[in-house]
Amino acid sequence: MRVKGGVNSKKKKRKYLKAAKGYRGALSRRYRLAKQYYIRSGVYAYVGRKQKKRDFRKLWITRINAAARMEGIKYSELIHGLKLSGVNINRKMLADLAVNDFEAFKEYVALAKEALGK
């Protein structure tokens, strides 16, 4: 007797169609398309996780630059001054200070200016 494997193939199809729920049009109803776009969605998710790191770094730099210019110094000068003064603070923390605790940020700016001789 021939074994057709109906249960397993139905289970596999159900897995992809369930995952593709919410996709537009035929992508959520046709197995072949649902499987292709399910795999594609994994690629998008992988790329997105890498992109997120770039996006956040860009956001932090923008925030630091805006706050630094309010204090009369450029972003690049601030970072260089902090390196010269031996302050080891990352951009995420610096951006958080610029937004939430501006007085503490001003102290870091003063340290950078002092190291640069401004």
From Swiss-Prot:
CDD domains hit by this protein: Ribosomal_L20
Any single GO BP term: translation
GO cellular component: ribonucleoprotein complex; ribosome
Pfam families the UniProt entry points to: Ribosomal_L20
One Gene Ontology term of the molecular function aspect: rRNA binding
Entries under Gene3D superfamilies matching the protein: 6.10.160.10, Ribosomal protein L20
Keywords for the protein's UniProt record, in alphabetical order: Ribonucleoprotein, Ribosomal protein, RNA-binding, rRNA-binding
The keyword Disulfide bond appears for this protein: no
Function: Binds directly to 23S ribosomal RNA and is necessary for the in vitro assembly process of the 50S ribosomal subunit. It is not involved in the protein synthesizing functions of that subunit.
Family of the protein in this entry: Belongs to the bacterial ribosomal protein bL20 family.
Name the record gives this protein: Large ribosomal subunit protein bL20
Species assigned in the record: Kosmotoga olearia (strain ATCC BAA-1733 / DSM 21960 / TBF 19.5.1)
